[in-house]
Amino acid sequence: MQRKVLYGVLLAAPFIGAYPVFVMKVLAFALFAAAFNLLIGYTGLLSFGHAMFLATAGYATGYSMQTLGFTPELGVLVGTVAATLLGLVVGLFAIRRQGIYFAMITLAFAQMVYFIYLQAPFTHGEDGLQGVPRGRLFGLLDLSNDVALYYVVLAVVVAACAFIVRVVHSPFGQVLVAIKENEARAISLGYDTDRFKLLAFILSAALAGLAGSLKVLVLGFETLSDAYWTMSGLVVLMTLVGGMGTLFGPLLGAALIVALEDRLGDIGEWLASTTGVAWFHSLGESATIVTGLIFIACVLAFRRGIVGEMVARIKPLRATS
């Protein structure tokens, strides 16, 4: 029932007052968080460099469409493939280590990628790629129409999330969970855990790249902020807020964080007029502080995230009913 309501709201969003570009931005980040959750929530690998896949796909899609004249479907494909190949290269090095060492290797690669994009001529440095055209999907559907693009993005994100669900519930996904819970036992059962972790890393990178390609298609630009380490931190926060290791948690976390960052100024103005505290007028300029406070609250108060806490509370009620 809840899923039907959610699907109904998403299908009707452009006609019930929702700003299509904002909702598409939320969908792109929701897919980014879901891709990251596949790695940390089900495989137990914490990456501090997932922003490099988002940015790589964004730059590849933007450049191929703006400079090479590729169609949207080819541009998205190029971006996703670029992120997948980068995931393969990084994964071959990173999976040889565990825990904090794995995280630091991904962070080191991400910083290296950031400085490459800062200097590379095709990224236009700090100016980024501006004015990326949306084009026509398969030469037929004009994506300059926000509503048309919205349904394309929605279909892609739903299909990608369905793919993640299928992966999680497949024998491959069960092996990933076994590696997360007890890698030594998985090895003793004869599984090549490094191979499974590498495949999970590549899948996560590819899906993060798909999110980056959709994002540049929606917004029409790609900047260095997508490659910076703070973007990797942001997707960690989205996953923690929603609920790590849950299917809907990262989607909810992404929606909340993106909405908060986008509407923080409006919230500050409302609080200032309600409470009379002038400081709230500058709340929109304090997004980093607010997200930091949210991160602390998650760690201290509800470590399982919103969806994780809800599931933990509902399960005993179902068992007793």
What are these regions (language model features)?
Residues 1-321:
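Transmembrane alpha-helices and adjacent helix-loop boundaries
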